[in-house]
Each structure stands twice: as C-alpha cells, then as structure tokens.
Amino acid sequence: MSARSSGLVAAAALPVPSSSSSVAGGDVPRPPPRRRAASVAGQQQTRQEFGNGYTPRRSLAAVNDSGDSCHLRIVVLTGQSLAKKDIFGASDPYVRIDLNTINGDINIDSVLTKTKKKTLNPTWNEEFIFRVKPSEHKLVFQVFDENRLTRDDFLGMVELTLVNLPTEQEGRTIGEQSYTLRPRRSVGAKSRIKGTLRIYHAFIRETREQSEPSSGNSDGEWEHVEATNAGETSAQPHPFPTGGHDALPAGWEERQDANGRTYYVNHTARTTQWDRPTVLNSHSSQSTDDQLASDFQRRFHISVDDTESGRSADSISHNSIEDNNNAAGLAYTPKTAATSSAPPNTPTNNNGILAQIAMQYRAEEDQDPTVDHTSFVYNSLRHPVAHRQPEISATSLQNDLRPVREAPGVPDIAITNPFTRRAAGNMAGGAGWQQERRRQQMQLHIQQHQQRQQQQQQNRILLDVDHRQQEPQHRGQRHQQQHRPSNEDTDHTDSHNPSDISAPSTRRNSEEDNAAVPPMEQNTGGEEEPLPPRWSMQVAPNGRTFFIDHASRRTTWIDPRNGRASPMPNQTRRVEDDLGPLPEGWEERVHTDGRVFYIDHNTRTTQWEDPRLSNPNIAGQAVPYSRDYKQKYEYFKSHIRKPTNVPNKFEIRIRRTSILEDSYRIISSVTKTDLLKTKLWVEFEGETGLDYGGLAREWFYLLSKEMFNPYYGLFEYSAMDNYTLQINNGSGLCNEEHLSYFKFIGRIAGMAVYHGKLLDAFFIRPFYKMMLQKPIDLKDMESVDTEYYNSLMWIKENDPRILELTFCLDEDVFGQKSQHELKPGGANIDVTNENKDEYIKLVIEWRFVARVKEQMSSFLDGFGSIIPLNLIKIFDEHELELLMCGIQNIDVKDWRENTLYKGDYHMNHIIIQWFWRAVLSFSNEMRSRLLQFVTGTSRVPMNGFKELYGSNGPQMFTIEKWGTPNNFPRAHTCFNRLDLPPYEGYLQLKDKLIKAIEGSQGFAGVD
C-alpha cells in the first residue's frame, strides 16, 4: 500500500546492524516479547545436516529444571488448500505456535513463522526447538491470514499433545505428519476453515555423550586441535544445549535471549557468558569471580551495598597492546588481558622473569605439541613460576586479570572457544608456520611484560610525587594510582573505591558507555577552601566527585572540608540532544543493547521513560482533560442534522498551487449546502492518493494557511503577536468581493466543525464572543492590545478631564486620517467621570464590532449554513476556540502515552526510544510539522491525542516498522500511521525524519 512520499532520494545502501544479545542486568527493565520473531526460513536439510553450522530457532521460554523436561523439534513445512480470505482469492498465511499447559490452557511461549504472500499452498520449512514437559504441555498451531488494516483472519488450528511423539535416533527415519485444520472451540467462531498443515515433530535424543567432550580435553568446555594435522578436527558440538549437560555450578543460571540463543548468568559476579560453565572451572575461577564482582560494584558505585563497602578496590590501568603479528588468518577472540603489577618501591627483575617465562614456554611446547599457545600464556599469568620475585604473588597476578575491550587486530591472550581454536588449527600449513607462530607469540608476550613494567614504574613515580608534595595543586594533574590491599588497609570499612582511576589513553572506549562522563580530576574546591594535607579530589566516570585520602589509601564520597557527601551529578547530555539537565537525583545510562534507561536514586528505581517528559518546559504543557467539554461535544454531535437525499460523497478536485482559488470556486458554487455535509473526497491534481480522511485533513490545513494569510487582506494580526488573527476592517479596499470570501470562509469553518477537522489558525477572543453573540468587555481588550487596554483602564480609574477627550476617535486608513463619532454629535461631547463608562463601552464596540460588522455577518452566514448558530451557544469562547482550532502547544508525554506500535516495535524498542528523543528535542513548531506530516493536521483535539480521528472514527497515533535504513519515513494520514524504518543510529533517524518532514511533496496510494 502506498503512502505519503518524502520526495527525497535515498542514500546509498547502509549495512544492517546485527541484533544485540540480551544481557541480564540488575534493575534494567526488560522489553516485552516481540510480536514477530526473526525466523530462519528455507531450511530443507535432513535431521543429520543440522550439525553442520545450522542453528534452529529456539523457544523464548527456558524451563530450567531437570525434571521430565526435554527438547522437542518442530518443523512447520507446508500448508495445503487453505481458505481464501483476500478479495483477490488468495491469503497471506503465517503460523503461530503456542506452548500451553494442558491444565488451564495457560500460554507459556509463542513463536511465529514468516508470512507467505498471496498463496493458498504456502511453504515455510521453518524449524523451532521447544523445551517441554510432555505430561504437562501441549502445542497449538494456529494459521492466520495477515491483514495490515484490520485484525488477522483465522484460517484454522491444530492442537498437538506431546505424550506419544517419536524420538530421534540414529538410523531411524521419522516421517512428516499432515493434520486437518479445525475451527476454534468457541461457540461464536464462524470462520470458514479448510486445508491441511504438514508438520515434522520429534523429541531430540538427549544423551550425555552429546554434550561431553573427549576425554583428552583438560576442560569440559574446550577442545585442543592437533597443530601438526590441520585436517583432523573434532566432531561439531550440538548447536543447542541438551539435557545431558552436568548441573550448573552454584550461583549460575541458564537463560535464553530474544533470538533463542542460550547464555549463562553468574549471579555471584553479575556477569554473563555464552559458554556453559562447569564445576571445575567454576572453582578454579572463584577468586576471579570475586574480582569481577568487585569491578561491578565499582562500576555501579552509586548504590554500592554496605556489605561490599569494606572491600578494597584496585584501580588498574589497562594498556592497549599493539599487534606485531603479521601472520594472516589467526582467529583470536579478544576476551581478557593480563596485567601484572608490583607494589610500590619494590624492584623487580624483568630479565629473570622473562627468561623463566620463555624457558617454560619452550618446555611446554616440547612436552605437548597439541597444547594451545594462548592457553599457555593465560596459565603462565595465572600460575607464575616458583623462581619469580616474592612480591609478585599469584594472587596479585590473578587479580590483575580484567576483561577489557581491545581494538580490532589485537591478538588474544586468553583461552579461545573450540570453534575459534578449530579455525586456527585448520589454517596451520606445516612445521615452519608453527615455529614462526611460536616465535611471534613469544616476542609479543615479552613485549607485553616490558610495557607493563614500564607502566608500573611510571605509576610508582607519580604516586611517590603525590605522597611527597602534600599540596592541593596536584589535584589538577592526571595520574593513575594503583592500590593493593594490605593488612592495615583491610580494617577500613567506611569507604569504597567508586571506580577505576585511569588515564584516557588506557581507559576502555565503548559506545555502550557513551552516557558516562570520562574520568577526570579537577581542583574546583581548591579555589574556595583547600583540601586537608594528603587529600585529593577526582571525578568518577558518572560525573560524581569523590575524595582520596593518600595517608590511609581510602576513597570516599564525603568531602573532608564540610563532612557532606558530594551531590549526585546531573547527567551530561550529548551534543545532539539539547534537552537540558535531568531532575535532581536522576542518572541516565545505556543498556547493553544500546537503549537508554534512567535511574532514580531518590527511590532506587529504574525506568525507560525519560523523566524530562514530565517537565512542561521541555515536553510542552499538559493537556487538561475537560469532562464538561466532552459532554457538550457529544450533545453537539447528536443534535447536528444529517443530510438526506444527497450522494455518498462530495468530490473536491484542486491544485496545490492554487488551492484558495479552486476551493473558493467549488465551495461557493454549491447552492444545496447539504452536499457539503456528505463525505468529502479530496483529490490533488497530479497525485494518486485515495482520500479516506487524510487528504481531507490536509486540505483543511493547507486551505487555512491561505485563507487566513494577511497577504490577501481579509485578516490581519492583532497588536499583541504575529499569529493571533482578527478581521481586517479595511478588507473591502483589498478585495472588492471580500464579503463573498468571508461567506466562503464561514462555510469552510462550518465544514471543519461538522466533519471533525481543525483549522490552522487562532483568532482573538472577541471573535469567538461575536460568534456566540456575547457582549465584549474591557478584559477582552487586554489580550488584543495591551497599550490600548492600559489607556482605557487609566480612564476608568482616574479623572479623564485632564486628557480633554471627546466621543470621537481618530482613524488612520492607509495613511489618511479620519474621525469617527462614537455617537451622534460625539465630537462636541467631553469625556467626564460621569460618562467615562459609556465612552469605554462605545470604544470597545467600535473597535471590535462596528468596524467589521459586515464581514462578521457574512462569515456567520456561511458558518450557519452548515452548523446552526444556536447549537454552538452551549460552548463558551474558550471551548469554541478548541472546537474549531484545537490545541496549539503539543504535549509530548500525552503524545507518547497515546501511541500504538505495530510490527516488531514496542514502547521500549531502541528505535522508538530514538524517535521520542528526537521529538523531545524538536521545537513546538517542528512537532506540529511532524504531526501534520503524519495526521494531516498540526492541531491536537481538545482532550489530547486520545481523541485523534482517522478514516473510521477515533484512530490513535501509530508507528509501524517498515523498510530499510536507506528509506525515508512515510506517513498514512488516513490511519494516523508513521512507517518508520529500523535506522542504525539516533542521528540517522533524526536526520531522515527531518528531511522527510521538510521534503514532503504529496500523496500516493491510500490516505
């Protein structure tokens, strides 16, 4: 279905980003399940082919108990002779698979296949893996016909019990089953059902042999590749976990992300990983887990637990390592980097250490040619040789192992996964290649040790200088402090190191951490009051200031000068978002998948919604709901007379370049005004849009711009501003047919009210009072002309005789002066205390009523031909303004709360977050233009976005996923829907959206 086009040429094709994996986080909100999961279609392999790199989709539900649960393989193959639902005799079928409980029919999980367009015999060939309990669960297959305009049509269902299903075994062939589609069991189900659904289903054989590696492996999760025989590789492990695995270690949990991939959560260290942990490597890395947990507490130092506050925290700088390895094709996975350190003022024998490492390296190579070289480097750092200096203990080296994000091309010095290791082994070309590889890795390892020793020496020099100076001026210098727990340090439990303190050149640089402020030191407090001796001040990565006591080697949030904690920072915005600071006590962070969430440290809660949406200065004034107005409007609509004996629609064919003249000619020529009350069908010349409400709103919007343009001389701006309009009393001098035009404008205003559209104009308050035939008082003058109002107020409150005024006013018409008597003989009547009230009343009547009486009479004549004037008298002047013109200021929070999402989008989707961030950064004018681009009108109804109207009545603002990042957004004004492509970044989305709004040219298709 076509839609409003942006009229802009799309940019070159951009790469589509890969989906981010979900990572378990403490208080980070979880998004709701997607409406339609990404599927793997077109796979026609046999059951034996699944081991060759093919990974089937898995259920989103993960049953994490080891009772009678097992894996069930489902392959949705084809459908035959389905029912016809589309008007052209075809359907767009897809299958929804529900995993339900037998008792209570409670839904556990749902997945969907892809939609096959315009066919009654679809072929899906999509495979799914469910973890089920056969005695408690069942599967329900429902076939639907996708419909983008209304709800999807039901084509039939199959209910499958799981008790007697076959199990896959080697040498056994399991056939496909064909099931007849049946209707729902509900009494009111009347859908026409026919056809069959072909399905393959079988339990996956789950044995311990499938999950256990060969006995020759030193680790249950890793395999070693023979370096001398690149052609021999171990068997490919099963692409999905099975029930044959050993039990998870204590504190671990198995989960699945939105794409069906299994990952493992370490609740002790609060980390996640793809590889399944075992009890062996869990115990061997317990101290590493403790260190990672400490790292986590430092990173989220705002809400550190009291039980963790006593732990000493190391501030380790990670050195980036240059890759001097020129051998192409090495498949290393950067995971961890090892950093060794020595306590301050302790000399280390670099040459001895490096020589011993080299000897052990060669000995290890000679003993076992199959050992992985990267494993040796990792183990040599975790288990140092016995002759190493006593100051460099195994614990200190082990604590230095930190996960870092290194630049591309940096070789790994940690154990790689079996697939990476196999890839590296396959590329081994012979003994010469192996020797060159050993030599290069050894050189790299020695170079890394030298770099670490040099960095430690620099750190010790900086630390010694800091201890000697004892002056606050050192706070302005950037340095790195390495602190190791000692016996006297372990007793201090009143503070906790808030974060790692590192130089910008060695600090992790991640896009996911772009909401944090880089760590820095400042000496702002030194200007007011110097810090005590041996104290310094720094800024944590989140922007909060903390203090360092070098005497006791402690850090604290408490300012030693006044005893108060440093204030929470207002998160610094990025340059593209000039939205102002966050409220006090709030912090913005970026989730692992790129979405932004907000932390309220006052209540210790997290949320996806930007708290600035509640700030009317940023998001716009809130729309006050009026129940009284709602009742009046319903009464008004019920008493409007419906036309009889008229055609189904009234066609209006116009040109955009002459919309005022064409509309005036068509509307003024209508003698039977009931025709104007029928359904409007607007067509713009040269455009193929079909008007189902959107084009009519566009017509009213564009015509309002022209009708009320002061350029034509019919209206003029009031003295207060340049957007509030009043009737030009000299309109007859600009247009001889001005009264006919005012009647035409009255008809347009009446048609807008009758059809529930809005005019893009705002009139002065006396204009609405004249429509309601209410008297105009002095207070109404204040909003039109403040100076004139102040003059009349002075006359009202003082004796006007000193001004020597008469009942006669001077009038300037196009430079010609003239006098107008407010009453007969007024030029000879002085204004006194006795008659000043009469004078003020006559001035107001002449200013607002008498001068424009003919124009207003023609306007009401045209308006009354559509809407009886007695019906609008139930409204006051404020409500009449909202009835005709809507609300000018747009409340983004109300807009967001009354928006629907379709496709894969939901309220917390990253694309939707970027969209609302862009809207929040827009000015009110740009928000109005966006609203006009999508709905056809720039005005909001009286009670907000909940009362937006579409082609068939109330229609909420809708955002649907569509297109590629190369496309511009497009709008369906008849449905108030914005088709928003999945852009790759916030700036790209904002730029494309602005260009689409500003480059909109017309309509094409249904609108």
Curated annotation (Swiss-Prot):
Reaction equation(s) it catalyzes: S-ubiquitinyl-[E2 ubiquitin-conjugating enzyme]-L-cysteine + [acceptor protein]-L-lysine = [E2 ubiquitin-conjugating enzyme]-L-cysteine + N(6)-ubiquitinyl-[acceptor protein]-L-lysine
Tissues in which the protein is found: Ubiquitously expressed.
GO molecular function: myosin binding; Notch binding; protein domain specific binding; sodium channel inhibitor activity; ubiquitin protein ligase activity; ubiquitin-protein transferase activity
Biased composition annotated in UniProt, kind: Polar residues: 312-327, 498-507
Top-rank taxon, per record: Eukaryota
Pathway(s) the chain acts in: Protein modification; protein ubiquitination
Domain C2: residue ranges: 52-175
Region ranges (Disordered): 15-58, 303-327, 394-539, 558-586
UniProt domain HECT: residue ranges: 672-1006
InterPro entries, alphabetized: C2_dom (IPR000008), C2_domain_sf (IPR035892), E3_ub_ligase_SMURF1 (IPR024928), E3_ubiq-protein_ligase (IPR050409), HECT_dom (IPR000569), Hect_E3_ubiquitin_ligase (IPR035983), WW_dom (IPR001202), WW_dom_sf (IPR036020)
Active site: C974
Domain WW span(s) in chain numbering: 246-279, 529-562, 580-613
Chain intervals with Low complexity compositional bias: 15-26, 441-462
PROSITE patterns: C2, HECT, WW_DOMAIN_1, WW_DOMAIN_2
Gene3D superfamilies the record matches: 2.20.70.10, C2 domain (2.60.40.150), Hect, E3 ligase catalytic domain (3.30.2410.10), Hect, E3 ligase catalytic domains (3.90.1750.10)
The keyword Isomerase belongs to this UniProt entry's keyword annotation: no
Entry's Gene Ontology BP terms: axon guidance; axon midline choice point recognition; imaginal disc-derived wing vein morphogenesis; negative regulation of Notch signaling pathway; negative regulation of smoothened signaling pathway; neuromuscular junction development; Notch signaling pathway; positive regulation of cardiac myofibril assembly
Subunit organization: Interacts (via WW2 domain) with comm (via PY-motifs). Interacts with N.
UniProt name for this protein: E3 ubiquitin-protein ligase Nedd-4
Organism: Drosophila melanogaster
